[in-house]
Amino acid sequence: MIVVQVSDTHIKSKGKLAYNKVDIHKALYNCILHINNLKPKPDLVIFTGDITDNGTNEEYKLFKETVKLLDVPFYVIPGNHDNAENLKREFEEYDWFEENNHLSLVIEDFPIRIIGLDSSIKGKSYGGLSEERLLWLEKQLNKFPDKKVLLFIHHPPVKIGIEHMDVQNLQIGRERLADLLGKYEQVLALACGHVHRVSTTLWNKIIVLTAASPSHQVALDLRKDAKAEFVMEPPSVQLHYWTEEQGLTTHTSYIGKFEGPYPFYNEKGELID
């Protein structure tokens, strides 16, 4: 099974560049083309928050126009830049969300279960999990204790060493989430967005993964006084590849035209020297 994770598309109003620099509309289009050209074809795509930059209806409509080009099913959960009411209204036809007070979802139609957990708090850049959301998650994990789960959330519960991002990670319900996940061994990993960088952290025996953006990336600067800056490093998506024999492997798939592929071996089967 292949799950593509896309995070932090930050779609703005038509013709608007992010930070007067980044053509996020073109970036999303290129991302969709990239996913459609993947071999083998993924089973689904999940967008892990910050779908839009300001949460307006116009931005969600523009996002939807582009992602409808996908050849595979897609799902979304919100991030801190999103507006939950507008997001739910614009995607009401998809019937993803079963709760009224948060936009969390469960996908049951595959060899492993996909759970998307809403960590957004209206008006806040940091994330949080209320007791209601945590109880909902616990209920979902109790349903099929023998079936593996890949859990998605926007805000990572860990610090990645970039100060201006770490102060706006998952701030509320973090310890309760750690305790909860520690009880359920079927959770393969917690896959996050928000930080615009690929990272891996072992947190309370739980693998926490973060994804880069298909547009711009947060600058990698681990100094305590580092400025809040972005760089135009190669855009990418995450490919979460699961097999029953081995379990979960996650790849970073870069978007763009690169040299190659070139063969390692010649026509005689000899290593090219």
From Swiss-Prot:
Q: Which Gene3D superfamilies match?
A: GpdQ, beta-strand dimerisation domain, GpdQ, catalytic alpha/beta sandwich domain
A Gene Ontology biological process term: glycerol metabolic process
**Which positions does UniProt annotate for Fe cation 2 binding?**
D50, N80, H154, H194
EC number(s) given by UniProt: 3.1.4.46
One function term, GO molecular function aspect: metal ion binding
Per its Swiss-Prot or TrEMBL entry, what cofactor is needed? Fe(2+)
Q: Which residues bind Fe cation 1?
A: D8, H10, D50, H196
**Catalytic activity entry:** a sn-glycero-3-phosphodiester + H2O = an alcohol + sn-glycerol 3-phosphate + H(+); sn-glycero-3-phosphoethanolamine + H2O = ethanolamine + sn-glycerol 3-phosphate + H(+)
Please indicate which superkingdom the organism of origin belongs to: Bacteria
- InterPro entries assigned to the protein according to its UniProt record, in alphabetical order: Calcineurin-like_PHP_ApaH (IPR004843), CNP_phosphodiesterase-III (IPR050884), GpdQ/CpdA-like (IPR026575), GpdQ_beta-strand (IPR042281), GpdQ_catalytic (IPR042283), Metallo-depent_PP-like (IPR029052)
Cofactor annotation remark: Binds 2 Fe(2+) ions per subunit.
The record's Pfam families line, in alphabetical order, gives:
Metallophos
Q: Which UniProt keywords apply?
A: Glycerol metabolism, Hydrolase, Iron, Metal-binding
Indicate the family of this protein.
Belongs to the cyclic nucleotide phosphodiesterase class-III family.
Q: What does this protein do?
A: Catalyzes the hydrolysis of the 3'-5' phosphodiester bond of glycerophosphodiesters such as glycerophosphorylethanolamine (GPE), a typical phospholipid metabolite.
PANTHER family from the UniProt entry = CYCLIC NUCLEOTIDE PHOSPHODIESTERASE CBUA0032-RELATED, PHOSPHOHYDROLASE
This chain belongs to which protein, by name?
Probable glycerophosphodiester phosphodiesterase GpdQ
